[in-house]
Regions:
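N-terminal glycine-rich FAD/FM-binding segment characteristic of electron-transfer flavoproteins
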Residues: 1-340
Length: 340
């Protein structure tokens, strides 16, 4: 009762990386609250396959739901598993990835339990809250932090009265790590039929296709990112050339993607991917909160911008004050001369 829960996604018998990231964060939240970390995973043929991918992240108790029809994911059975289990266990916090599955499952579960959900959080913390209207004081609430109003401010959202406090987080926002402390590491295997009625399985997935990623933006050690200041699709061609020389990948701000200069799967930020490269070169990017949320944990940040007051310069380690179309060709020329 009153524990922290994480819903773990699987692709076949492989646990999603975002789930392991949330387990790491969930363990920290559970420690702060003095409660246990519990995890849920549902699929087909996963018993004996997923435990070693989940328990090492500090899980006290893992609920493994294994039955035909639970993979590939469909809405009804997974919703009933979580809703009925949460009614029994009464968690204080429930987390899941802000993925295609999480965006479908999270609202269904929170609506069924009349709790509430904050999507696409960039940080999760524990803190107190004073309700000025009622005069009530709440301790140990989940601070659900995310950009709001088009990314112009950062909002901290709390859910004082309803449980569980639910949040989704994008892949790459949190960092995963094996837990070195003490925890129970217990796995249980509930009977699926007690949680899921037979009619939930009326939908059958006939074909399941997973498309391979076109690039490794999230895993790249060097990212060259362009914003609206790059000026054109041709300008991005130069960024691709620079990234190739540096053995890196190209990313972009939302403004550049909306302009049609680069594909959406390269968008970095709150509505794109989160990256943690060793070096992040921001070219013509102003640095709205929404974008910074997706790259602020980079090792070294280099800003190329003709505006000395651009917000991104405040978090940059190095600033090159100049036009992208002047600076980038010089960088390319330099690296070509010195990489031979």
């Amino acid at each position: 009762m009153n524990n922290v829960f994480v819903y773990c996604e699987v692709e076949g018998t492989t646990v999603a990386e975002v789930s392991q990231e949330l387990l790491t964060k969930g363990r920290k939240l559970a420690n702060q609250q003095g409660v246990e970390l519990h995890a849920i995973v549902a699929g087909t043929g996963i018993k004996g396959q997923v435990e070693d991918q989940i328990l090492p992240y500090g899980v006290d108790k893992l609920f493994v739901f294994d039955a035909e029809g639970l993979f590939p994911y469909t809405s009804a059975p997974h919703t009933d598993i979580l809703v009925n289990l949460f009614k029994e266990e009464k968690p204080q916090i429930a987390l899941m990835g802000a993925t295609v599955i999480g965006r479908d499952l999270g609202p269904r579960v929170s609506s069924s339990l009349t709790s509430g959900l904050t999507a696409d959080c960039t940080e999760l913390e524990i803190g107190d809250y004073d309700d000025k209207k009622s005069g009530k004081h709440y301790e140990g609430l989940l601070y659900q932090i995310r950009p709001a109003f088009g990314g112009n401010i950062v909002a901290t959202i709390v859910n004082p009265e309803h449980r569980p406090q639910m949040a989704t987080v994008r892949s790459g926002v949190m960092q995963k790590s094996i837990y070195e402390g003490e925890c129970k590491k217990e796995a249980v295997y509930p009977e699926v039929s007690k949680y899921v009625p037979a009619e939930d399985f009326v939908v059958k997935v006939l074909d399941h296709h997973v498309e391979a990623a076109k690039h490794n933006l999230k895993g790249s050690a060097i990212v060259v990112a362009g914003g609206y200041g790059v000026g054109s699709k041709e300008g991005f061609d130069q960024l691709f050339e620079l990234a190739h020389l540096l053995h890196g990948e190209v990313g972009a701000s939302r403004a550049a993607v909306d302009a049609g200069w680069v594909d959406h799967d390269r968008q970095i930020g709150q509505t794109g991917v989160t990256v943690h490269p060793k070096v992040y070169i921001a070219c013509g990017i102003s640095g709205q909160i929404q974008h910074i949320a997706g790259m602020q944990d980079s090792g070294i940040i280099i800003s190329v911008n003709n505006d000395p007051d651009a917000p991104i310069n405040k978090i940059a380690d190095y600033v090159i004050n100049g036009n992208v179309e002047d600076v980038v060709p010089k960088l390319i020329k330099y690296y070509k001369q010195n990489s031979k």
